[in-house]
Amino acid sequence: MSDDWDETDAAPASDWNIESFGLPTSFGSTKKTCNTGNAFNDGEGGFDEGSQSNFDDPFRSGGGGFGGRGRGGPRACFKCGDEGHMARDCPSASDSRGNRTNNRRQDNWGGGSSSKPANGEPFGFGSAFGDNQESDPFGATESSGFGFGSGSGSRGGRRNDGGRGCFKCGEEGHMSRDCPSGGGRNKGCFKCGQEGHNARDCPNPGEGSEEKKPRAPLYIPADVNEDELFVMGIEAGSNFDAYANVPANVSGAEPIQPAAESFQSMNLRPLLLENIVKAGYGCPTPVQKYTIPNVMNGRDIMACAQTGSGKTAAFLLPMLHYILDNNCPSNAFEEPAQPTGLVICPTRELAIQIMREARKFSHSSVAKCCVAYGGAAGFHQLKTIHSGCHILVATPGRLLDFLEKGKIVFSSLKYLVLDEADRMLDMGFLSSIKTVINHKTMTPTAERITLMFSATFPHEIQELASAFLNNYLFVVVGTVGAANTDVKQEVLCVPKFEKKAKLVEMCEEILISADDEKILVFVEQKRVADFVGTYLCEKKFRATTMHGDRYQAQREQALSEFRTGVHNILVATAVTARGLDIKGIGVVVNYDLPKDIDEYVHRIGRTGRLGNRGLSISFYDDETDACLTKDLVKVLSEANQTIPDWLTQKANASGHAQTYHGSGLFASSDIRSKNGGGRGWEKNQASSFLGGPSESNVDEEWD
């Protein structure tokens, strides 16, 4: 400290000019001399009366601060200020927060009021941490303070400490961590609330008060531009005529309506026929031929058809025909909403796509079609629904939310559709579906038409569905499980760390020949999607990403920009394969091969739809994809594709079992026929490989 003093500061205290401090040399009378003693001491002093000057040793113990009673010397109780005991033994009462309720002396924070007012004690500035000791002349302990004034003025900031009791309840005999009251806080795990383990060892991390992701920003989707509805659909390709040879089978009790060879022969409303032509539909697909006439005849349907076969129109057209033909009310501005038709599907993107298809077919009509899904503003969706709703397309989660809040009832429901039923069950929506079907307002089974559409219907799903279908027809169209012969398949051996460079090389080759070509890149992990998408952007490609960790607004924007050509490369996780029709996808790249061969078939089915040609390129990594070799060889062989020699060798040397055993004639069979029940007719023709089955489970929540 002495190294920083100038000459004046270093001079003896006896040579100091006290008047230069702006302080009087005496107070009161001539008999009261100024105490120029220890300015930073522990005891009584400062400018007090009757004391001798003490400035020569400003750091000596003995006096008070500048006029303040420093309360040095013997240590006093922090609570009441009395000497002779410590704060933890203070007899004065304290509450559980340490606030004194019976203090002998009233102290002002920073004000330093005196318990013995006297002349010359005008003010005081103090702190609860102001005990002036030689080691810290400016105060470092919890006795009293450094201040200006006199008397007890420097005690201005006394800290109020609690008693010896528990900090939570204020009672003695235990510590806060053992408090039986707990102050409303659970002694157990912070995540699940259970006892016996810490949060870091919690076996149920998804429960309790675990810190969750930040809340998604409020998102209100833009209104659908109806002029775009008719230009975004996939047009029939050069091989569309092959659909005429797809095998079909219909089983069930009579009467069964024969297949309709044209939309005009289905007796649909003229407005619907106009929109069908405007949408570019020339003739119905096989699933439409066999399903629409029977639905219009009032039959429940369980339809099994391959992806891209026109299932959406198969249930929307008869539903819209019924609404227009019977002039069904939309119940506008009434609460709760009472839709005539309800379509439940597993994913948000699929719900949006079905809603757009419904608006396309109902264009220029009074029919109102609405959508409800998670990730978007619920109040906005309810506002649209309550403005009038004939057909509601919804995901299970958001539908249950509206149902529990009493915003929707099913008392007027005529059509119930479960689209991609097997996928909803695979994703864990079984309990939600049961809750909807068993809701107290749901119309009885005999008074509604229930339709189920899926790529496959295993026996367990058929047994479950029989509980809420009434005298249904089982319709199976096409072979499912084989790859589309309209898709050329290429498998390249690319190690993990060479995939980026190979992808860039392939994209450059593809886009040189066709700059407007759309490329869909599949990856297995969400973080890989962002990594690959960013890498492609750095290489000056127009790429975007889509996966479950992106906000709904970002997902819809990415999909919209990919549809419209703003971006011509979409890097996505497998969820994009779930039933989406995207016009113009010419190439599908499996950057990461899936773990299940059925998902592989379904992925490559995103291209080559409705008779159009397509190309799929798969990167094979021997370290992660060896389990697929035998199945890949089988799929390529059935689709008449060229099989690389290296892949055949790896398949022969593989120790993994083959899980794919070919497509067979039909994807599913009616379990009632094995029990001797059901009547019907069967039409078998030459087999054609179109589409593929549902994909395996993924770790993303898309409801």
From Swiss-Prot:
Chief place of localization: cytoplasm
Domain of life, per lineage: Eukaryota
Domain annotation Helicase ATP-binding: ranges: 292-475
Region named Disordered: 1-22, 35-73, 88-167, 676-703
Swiss-Prot/TrEMBL keywords: ATP-binding, Cytoplasm, Developmental protein, Differentiation, Helicase, Hydrolase, Metal-binding, Nucleotide-binding, Nucleus, Oogenesis, Repeat, RNA-binding, Zinc, Zinc-finger
Annotated EC: 3.6.4.13
Annotated GO MF terms: ATP binding; ATP hydrolysis activity; RNA binding; RNA helicase activity; zinc ion binding
Encoding gene (name): vasa
Protein name (Swiss-Prot/TrEMBL): Probable ATP-dependent RNA helicase vasa-like
